[in-house]
Design a protein with these regions (language model features):
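An N-terminal hydrophobic leader/cap segment in hydrolases
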Residues: 2-49
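Alpha/beta-hydrolase superfamily serine-hydrolase fold, recognizing
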Residues: 11, 15, 44-318
């Protein structure tokens, strides 16, 4: 374990040896209590509610600069992490703020249905609905509709990859760039790093429990859709260019590298950085550490380049 990450990593492993459905629910309550006190500085936060097909409401947070630029900027769909089973958009406010302060972009972040409430495809459907809403409201949000980005970390990174595959196949909305940060991609857990991993924050036992909840009756089935587990994808063509980073002692290390390398083999620009001795979510738990600061510096550099160079027009509406 990297010396800069060791102390908090050791404490985290002691506090939560593994996540179960019970601990997912418990920590989700804590997260929601803490974030209710969060008041973002230097950015504006709004809330909209979208009508789901089942007549329930999807809560979506919109984050934007307090003083918008005159010109239009990229629009980002940000998907929070939490093993598909916990969390909310507000937990990532500091990362979201970094993107906004970088170039004045607008970030749309759905409070998607957690797997403790409904299994796949509920979360995917929510995130896709939010992406379509971002496309349809680009003008109102001062967003370039040819620069829609999708990003997220952990389970949010997995959903980022899922949404980009789903959008490619549905052909209803174009995504210009994706950032699936240390993503949760493979339900099969067949890679070396995903097996017998007792790393801090997220380990093999937690991973198994989360996938069971997320997939429900699909768990351990051979025909799990690629939209649920993107590592099962075979056709990587026409996916958006991508960037990610990942630690090499966490469960998602191998599946992240494999996914990015397969994109590169398909001719998709895909850059990634591996951090030696870094565990899952190190950039959040040890945000002040040298590896974390470096990871976010490189992340923002890639985001800046994408903002300057990557565009993809929306398909004509039928």
């Amino acid at each position: 374990m990297d010396k800069n990450l060791r102390v908090l990593g050791t404490i985290a492993r002691w506090i939560v040896p593994q996540y179960t459905e019970r601990t997912f629910r418990f920590f989700n309550g804590i997260i929601n209590t803490l974030i209710s006190k969060t008041r973002p500085r230097k950015i504006k936060a709004e809330t909209v509610f979208l009508d789901r097909p089942d007549k329930t409401k999807l809560r979506v947070r919109i984050f934007s600069p307090k003083k918008p630029k005159g010109e239009k900027t990229p629009g980002m769909l940000w998907i929070h992490g939490g093993g598909f089973c916990m969390g909310s958009p507000e937990q990532d406010i500091w990362t979201i703020r970094e993107y906004i302060l970088e170039n004045g972009c607008t970030v749309v972040a759905p409070c998607y249905t957690l797997a403790t409430e409904k299994p796949y495809p509920a979360a995917l459907d929510d995130c896709y609905q939010a992406l379509l809403w971002l496309r349809d409201n680009a003008e109102k949000l001062n967003v370039r509709d040819d620069q829609l980005f999708v990003a997220g970390s952990s389970a949010g990174g997995g959903l980022t990859a899922s949404i980009c595959i789903y959008a490619r196949d549905k052909k209803e909305v174009s995504v210009a760039y994706q950032m699936p940060l240390y993503p949760m991609l493979d339900d099969r857990m067949i890679t070396p790093s995903s097996q017998n991993n007792d790393g801090p924050v997220w380990n093999t036992a937690s991973n198994i429990n989360a996938w069971k909840l997320y997939l429900g009756d699909l768990y351990q089935k051979a025909d799990v859709p690629v939209y649920a587990a993107p590592a099962r994808l075979e056709d990587y063509s026409d996916l958006p260019p991508a960037f990610t980073f990942v630690g090499d002692i966490e469960p998602f290390y191998n599946e992240t590298v494999n996914f990015m390398e397969k994109m590169k083999s398909a001719g998709i620009p895909a850059d990634y950085k591996v951090y030696h001795g870094a565990y899952h979510g190190f950039d959040v738990l040890c945000w002040f550490s040298k590896p974390s600061r470096d990871a976010h510096r490189i992340m923002l550099e890639n985001y800046r380049r994408a903002s300057e160079n990557l565009f993809k027009a929306q398909p004509e509406k039928k």
